[in-house]
């Protein structure tokens, strides 16, 4: 079975929630997409910081280039917040044909059109969801948004 490789940008309250939700819904995601979901990288500001969840099985990095240069990453999930440098990271992710899911309202308020146009040009998905309940909508974006669109799931197969 193929893997769906994910990079998570941020491991605060929402990012920790995303990790928990992905772990709790791993089988549902696998059944829906017929792929094993793997959190391959997690970008954090400080890899030595104590975390509220067990992250021993995950690769933490402070270097965005590890994610951008990893051709195996299918989806970048951004929950760091802020506009700069986040918008640059999302633009570069889209340019490298990585699907993007974000919960960043501030960034979208300023750069939504730019990111949507870039996603369309690259043939990848840009999904945005509110971060209610620490990440639940992220699973909806993975299951429904990427699975329901032939155009976008072809890149995941």
Model-inferred region functions:
Residues 1-95:
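N-terminal glycine-/serine-/threonine-rich beta1-alpha1-beta2 phosphate-ribose binding loop
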Residues 80-96, 105-142:
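Rossmann-fold NAD(P)-binding glycine/threonine-rich loop
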Residues 151-157:
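Conserved small/polar residues in nucleotide/adenosyl-binding loops
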Residues 43, 129, 154:
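Short beta-strand segments
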Residues 56-57, 141-144:
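Short, surface-exposed amphipathic charged segments that create phosphate/polyanion-binding patches used
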Residues 99-101:
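A short hydrophobic/small-residue beta-strand
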């Amino acid at each position: 079975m193929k893997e769906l490789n994910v990079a998570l940008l941020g491991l605060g309250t929402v990012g920790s929630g995303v990790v928990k939700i992905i772990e709790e819904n791993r089988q549902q995601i696998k059944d829906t997409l017929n792929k094993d979901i793997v959190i391959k990288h997690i970008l954090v500001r400080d890899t030595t910081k104590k975390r509220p969840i067990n992250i021993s099985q995950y690769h933490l990095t402070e270097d965005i280039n590890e994610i951008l240069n990893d051709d195996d990453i299918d989806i970048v999930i951004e929950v760091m917040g802020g506009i700069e440098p986040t918008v640059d990271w999302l633009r570069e992710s889209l340019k490298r044909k990585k699907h993007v899911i974000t919960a960043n309202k501030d960034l979208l308020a300023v750069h939504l059109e730019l990111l949507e146009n870039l996603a369309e040009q690259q043939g990848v998905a840009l999904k945005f969801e509110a971060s209610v309940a620490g990440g639940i909508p992220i699973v909806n974006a993975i299951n429904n948004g990427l699975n329901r669109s032939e155009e976008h799931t072809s890149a995941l197969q």
